[in-house]
From Swiss-Prot:
Reaction catalysed by this enzyme: L-serine(in) + Na(+)(in) = L-serine(out) + Na(+)(out); L-threonine(in) + Na(+)(in) = L-threonine(out) + Na(+)(out)
Gene name of the encoded protein: sstT
GO cellular component: plasma membrane
Main location: membrane
Chain's role: Involved in the import of serine and threonine into the cell, with the concomitant import of sodium (symport system).
GO MF terms, alphabetically ordered: neutral L-amino acid:sodium symporter activity
Organism: Pseudomonas aeruginosa (strain UCBPP-PA14)
Family matches, as InterPro entries: Na-dicarboxylate_symporter (IPR001991), Na:dicarbo_symporter_sf (IPR036458), Ser_Thr_transp_SstT (IPR023025)
Regions that span the bilayer: 17-37, 49-69, 83-103, 142-162, 180-200, 218-238, 301-321, 331-351, 357-377
GO annotation (BP), single: serine transport
Similarity-based family: Belongs to the dicarboxylate/amino acid:cation symporter (DAACS) (TC 2.A.23) family.
Record's protein name: Serine/threonine transporter SstT
Amino acid sequence: MTYPERPLLHLLTRTSLVGQIIVGLIAGLLLASFFPAAALKVGFIGKVFVSALKAVAPVLVFVLVMASIANHRQGQQTHIRPILLLYLVGTFSAAVVAVIASFAFPSSLVLASHPGEMSPPGGIAEVLQSLLLSVVDNPVNALISANFIGILAWAIGLGIAFRHASDTTRNLLSELSNGVSLIVKVVIRFAPLGIFGLVASTFAESGVEALKGYAHLLVVLLGCMLFVAFVVNPLIVFLKIRRNPYPLVLTCLRESGMTAFFTRSSAANIPVNLQLCERLGLHEDTYSVSIPLGATINMAGAAITITVLTLAAVHTLGIAVDVPTAILLSVVASVCACGASGVAGGSLLLIPLACSLFGIPSEVAMQVVAVGFIIAILQDSAETALNSSTDVLFTAAACLAEERKASAA
């Protein structure tokens, strides 16, 4: 197909989203540096982008989770129970690492507004009480008010109920999920313009301090991911196979992680992972199920992103967090991460759910999401590399452990 009369459209469709975001980020910095008055005016573009994210996020969570549970095949978990356990342990461990790192190296963000009417929770009891009330919220009201905890509860409940529905109904839910995901992708395609407006207005108002905040946040995020990849995951694998895990870890990072870093899609990396599993000589009936499932629920990188950005908002707003609440955040971040698969910007769009634990309003939470898009050039690539390479790593660890048991018997 050629575009002789539309060279700009041809350029946009052929250029990667990452490249376009980089251009938007640089353009925003240049505009803020040389024309600060104009930079403040284009901030409206960023506001439109954030509003679009706010509009699509509740529907996305509701439809995606409901369709995913409704279309889950019966008996799938019985074949991969050890791998499923590794996925869950790995994701929760990543969230715990992110909590510890966020307290050790707290990040502060430059937000447009700090609402004075906020009422942060007083402790774990108040958080749990608020959580229960959010769970039993009216589903329509939950969607309208962006009550993500209520949305998640209703999506899980309806998903379980629809598992017993006809194939036609479940196919309809799957098509609905695909339709919503397509709308999300369209919104994400406007990320370069949104980032341009956000960066320009932010730096025109706050100057280099905002850049320092983003740099610190990015270092914490990438540091957590590297720590999980080279310390936590090898420790989990060692406990499973009882031998040096690093040859396997490095193989997975090299063969799977590098590809995922550039594709920025766990789903797109599934064929690469399946081929790697075949080369490693793993059991086909196992990895043919565990790899696609891992691309759905094994989201250590997403758990890190959700936790670090949520606690960055908490620190910025001066909200005190006790240990039980931090543990609850780790659990919530892990659950959120499992629902972030296959969606452009999925982990970022689930940040408001985690923020709601601390009474942070949706307006502020979506500003944090926008910050996430600014640093997503590296964050999303590193997150996908960690997620996808861990799919193969834990699958291989479980298979090797089963072989060790069989040989010892």
